[in-house]
C-alpha cells in the first residue's frame, strides 16, 4: 500500500483503487457478486446523494445530508437526463415510478437496489450511510471487482484499513457453490499509476 502511494505519478491527490480477480463465473446467478461495504475512512470523494421519496420523508433526508430531494418533480429532472448525483435513494413504493428510467440509470450504476441499500424505508439512514462512505461493489463480466478505497493523501495505514474492510466484506460473499479458489489475485493502483500485485492478506 505504501508503494502505491509513493509511485503515484500525478500531482493531484490521486484515487487509490483495488482490483480483485475472483474465481467465480458471473453468468451463474449465485456467483454474480454484488454487495456494499462501509469503508471506515470513506473514499475521500464528496458524494452527491439524491432522494426520490414522498414529501413526508424530505425533512429527514435533508437533515441526513441529501443534496437533491424530490417527489414527482424529480422525475422531470430525469426526463431532461440531468444526472447531477452519484447515488440515488428511493423508497420501495416509489421504485415502480423509476422503471421507465432503467435504461438511463442502470448503465451508470445509479438505479436504486435493495442489495446496495439504496431502496430503503429508512431514507435518512440510507443517506447517512452513503455520505459516511458506504459503497457498492460488484463483479464485472471478467470476474473482477474494482473499488476505490481512498486517496493517496490518506496514507498507507488508512488505505490498508479500508482495503481490509472491503476484503472482509468480499470474503463474506463467497458463494457456497464455488469449489475452487475464490480470490485469485489482488492489485492496487493509483490514478495513472502502475498496477501493484499484493498478497491476499494485505
Language-model region placement:
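Flexible glycine-/small-residue-rich
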Residues: 20-22, 53, 91-92, 149-151, ...
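N-terminal charge/polar-biased segments
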Residues: 181-202
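Flexible, glycine/charged-enriched surface loops at secondary-structure junctions
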Residues: 12-16, 173-185
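Glycine-rich phosphate-binding loops that contact phosphosugars or nucleotide phosphates
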Residues: 60-67
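Translation machinery proteins
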Residues: 2-59
Amino acid at each position: 500500500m505504501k508503494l502505491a502511494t509513493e509511485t503515484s505519478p500525478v500531482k493531484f491527490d490521486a484515487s487509490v483503487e483495488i482490483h480483485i480477480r475472483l474465481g467465480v463465473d458471473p453468468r451463474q446467478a449465485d456467483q454474480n457478486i454484488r454487495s456494499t461495504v462501509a469503508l471506515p475512512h470513506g473514499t475521500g470523494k464528496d458524494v452527491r446523494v439524491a432522494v426520490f421519496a414522498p414529501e413526508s420523508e424530505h425533512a429527514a433526508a435533508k437533515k441526513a445530508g441529501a443534496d437533491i430531494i424530490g417527489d414527482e418533480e424529480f422525475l422531470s429532472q430525469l426526463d431532461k437526463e440531468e444526472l447531477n448525483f452519484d447515488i440515488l435513494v428511493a423508497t420501495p413504493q416509489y421504485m415502480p415510478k423509476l422503471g421507465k428510467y432503467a435504461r438511463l440509470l442502470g448503465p451508470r450504476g445509479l438505479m436504486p437496489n435493495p442489495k446496495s441499500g439504496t431502496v430503503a424505508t429508512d431514507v435518512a439512514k440510507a443517506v447517512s450511510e452513503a455520505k459516511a462512505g458506504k459503497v457498492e461493489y460488484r463483479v464485472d463480466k471478467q470476474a473482477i471487482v474494482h473499488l476505490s478505497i481512498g486517496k493517496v493523501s490518506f496514507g498507507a495505514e488508512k488505505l490498508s484499513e479500508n482495503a481490509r474492510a472491503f476484503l472482509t466484506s468480499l470474503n463474506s460473499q463467497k458463494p457456497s457453490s464455488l469449489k475452487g479458489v475464490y480470490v485469485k489475485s489482488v492489485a492496487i493502483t493509483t490514478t495513472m499509476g502502475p498496477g501493484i500485485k499484493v498478497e491476499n492478506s494485505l
